């Protein structure tokens, strides 16, 4: 058995547990919906903390042909696996604080306490791998196998590979000084732009909405990328769905008084996303030329992107997105989404759905081009709320005894995709994948494993493998439901081609079978 893999999943008790179970390598039965949540009541679920990893013990995959040009460093054939350190002063990766006094940039949580390392595979009795599989070539991709359901892991005393994962998380910790400096620079530019936008009648009510990985406390690697959303409350609007997409809409005003400053952006009855974004971009471009104490330039517009991207001091990238704020009821397409009833409770779900929703000027795909007048639903503020209050217990992660590994798993998943994108950046195979795909899959895994004990920090290796297994399943089945809009498939063929999904599947499978050598690159 590969040292990174967990043991085979245990079957649920006969007390009525209905969570689907299958091997990631050899699923039996009909394909499962990758985002289907267990339908059993809480009493019928497996006991808290009973997990089951993705594959059967000792399962192997067919070797792929080596590609010497793309080969990452792996252990030499016949080399013995190194023992994991017996004990070390491991510290939980923390989110660094922001610049003092920055109103718009909230300081992340303080550093978390140390975690104990898992023992070596020799101590656990696991069989260590001695022969790494050769890395797959750029287009050496398999045919998709049978899909598997999201596994429920079986807890073990020592998670395989946990020591390496904690070392990776340690590497991903952000420097307090670096994050404070970067956050301070971003805040200065953002404040300057907000003041200027408020002087324009169309954007007079604009405000800052703190969203993105910095505010979710899951930022990794370096504080060189920030997402900023400028929200603008709009009067009563009417949404007209575009081409049964469930996520893209035309925006109309129910009433349009003559004094409405947004009337200048109307195309007939429709609020033109392209016109409004063009004016937004023009104001920002003019204003950054007046910022004297900081070097700021605007990057070229990306096709279909709703963001205005700025580069500060040649090293900090800031995506600024305009968002319309609506305090109306959420659209009907979201009715079956946000399935957190068994995780965070039905009460929390009801409270979250009472919050506003947002619309960003994201162009819908239309053939080989884009429909430039559409707006896309956005719930990034709800995502932040969930990640910052992620425990079934309200005290989860508030003290040393109740720490979970949810955010650590998300950071590792984001880093895995980030590293693979860096490795293949010249080949463009992975350009259409983003951290949002990883975060969406992670939310679905949280839904299917709602108990805090199912994310025990001692089971980091198993929990991470669970997330990897689910993401692979979504790639194979070409189905990843938007967490808020179930009928909107983020992995549909018109958004991401099949070949790219097969390529990413092959790369992730190789990484998992060889203890993730990509974590040691770059």
From Swiss-Prot:
Record site feature (Arginine-anchor), residues: 255
Mutagenesis or variant effect for residue 300 to E: Reduced nucleotidyltransferase activity
Additional notes on this entry: The cGAS-STING signaling pathway drives sterile inflammation leading to type I interferon immunopathology in severe COVID-19 disease caused by SARS-CoV-2 virus infection. Tissue damages in the lung and skin lesions are caused by activation of the cGAS-STING signaling leading to aberrant inflammation. Endothelial cell damage is also caused by activation of the cGAS-STING pathway: SARS-CoV-2 infection triggers mitochondrial DNA release into the cytosol.
Outcome of substituting residue 77 to E: In 20DE phospho-mimetic mutant; causes inactivation of nucleotidyltransferase activity
Single GO cellular component term: cytoplasm
Full protein name: Cyclic GMP-AMP synthase
Effect of residue 176 to A: Strongly reduces enzyme activity and stimulation of interferon production
């Amino acid at each position: 058995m590969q040292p990174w893999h967990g043991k085979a999943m245990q079957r649920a008790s006969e007390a009525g547990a209905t969570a689907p179970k299958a091997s990631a390598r050899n699923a039996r039965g009909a394909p499962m919906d990758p985002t289907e949540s267990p339908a059993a009541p809480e009493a019928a679920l497996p006991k808290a903390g009973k997990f089951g990893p993705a594959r059967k013990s000792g399962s192997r995959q067919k070797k792929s042909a080596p590609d010497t040009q793309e080969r990452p460093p792996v252990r030499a054939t016949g080399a013995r696996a190194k023992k994991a350190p017996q004990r070390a002063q491991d510290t939980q990766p923390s989110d660094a604080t922001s610049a003092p006094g920055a109103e718009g940039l909230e300081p992340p949580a303080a550093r978390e306490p140390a975690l104990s390392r898992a023992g070596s595979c020799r101590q656990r009795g696991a069989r260590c791998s001695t022969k790494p599989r050769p890395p797959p070539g750029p287009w050496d991709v398999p045919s998709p196998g049978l899909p598997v359901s999201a596994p429920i892991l079986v807890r073990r005393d020592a998670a395989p590979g946990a020591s390496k994962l904690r070392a990776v998380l340690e590497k991903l910790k952000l420097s307090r000084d670096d994050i404070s400096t970067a956050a301070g620079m971003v805040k200065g530019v953002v404040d300057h732009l907000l003041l200027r936008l408020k002087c324009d009648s169309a954007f007079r009510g604009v405000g800052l909405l703190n969203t993105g990985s910095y505010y979710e406390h899951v930022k990794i690697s370096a504080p060189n990328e920030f997402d900023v959303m400028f929200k603008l409350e709009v009067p009563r609007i009417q949404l007209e769905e575009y081409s049964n997409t469930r996520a893209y809409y035309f925006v109309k005003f129910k009433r349009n008084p003559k004094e409405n400053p947004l009337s200048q952006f109307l195309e007939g009855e429709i609020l033109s996303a392209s016109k409004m974004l063009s004016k937004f971009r023009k104001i920002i471009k003019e204003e950054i030329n007046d910022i004297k104490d900081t070097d700021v330039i605007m990057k070229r517009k990306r096709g279909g992107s709703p963001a205005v991207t700025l580069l500060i001091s040649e090293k900090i990238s800031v995506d600024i997105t305009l968002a319309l704020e609506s305090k109306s009821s959420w659209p009907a397409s979201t009715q079956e989404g946000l399935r957190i009833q068994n995780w965070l409770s039905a009460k929390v779900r009801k409270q979250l759905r009472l919050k506003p929703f947002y619309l960003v000027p994201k162009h819908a795909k239309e053939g080989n081009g884009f429909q430039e007048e559409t707006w896309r639903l956005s719930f990034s503020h709800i995502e932040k709320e969930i990640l910052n209050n992620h425990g079934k217990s309200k005290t989860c992660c508030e003290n040393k005894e109740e720490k979970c590994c949810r955010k650590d798993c998300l950071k590792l998943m984001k880093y895995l995709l980030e590293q693979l994108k860096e490795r293949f950046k010249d080949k463009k195979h992975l350009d259409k994948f983003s951290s949002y795909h990883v975060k969406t899959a992670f939310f679905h895994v949280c839904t299917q494993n709602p108990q805090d004990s199912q994310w025990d920090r001692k089971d980091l290796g198993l929990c991470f493998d669970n997330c990897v297994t689910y993401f692979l399943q979504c790639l194979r089945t070409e189905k990843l439901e938007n967490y808020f809009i179930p009928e909107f498939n983020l992995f549909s063929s018109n958004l991401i081609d099949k070949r790219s999904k097969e390529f990413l599947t092959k790369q992730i499978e190789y990484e998992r079978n060889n203890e993730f050598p990509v974590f040691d690159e770059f």
